[in-house]
Amino acid sequence: MGGGGLKKRRIVSIAEFSIHPIGIGTSVGDYVKQALQAISKIEGLITRSLPMATILEAKNVHTILKAVEASHSALRSMGAKRISSILRIDERLDKPRMMKDKIESVRDC
């Protein structure tokens, strides 16, 4: 059997991502909308929007980083002169863990 079942199961990276254009005023909804539209075009990415961030789920960190770049590019194309983003990545390698699994594990406590 060697190698365990990890190769057969889906390994995922989960990230919490938020992006903030700076110097454009207090309303950023249009910018966030464009960033989310850009992210939605990334193949192999699952998203869940929350009030203060978006959760990204992908098979690898590379796909998550592509989403971050796409969102920055979208804001630059809208004329943003400065962009701040926060990215926190959970890349668990010992067992497969999707975002729904993490939520269910807390509910089961």
Question: Could you tell me what each predicted segment is?
Answer:
Residues G2-C109:
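Charge-rich, low-complexity N-terminal segments
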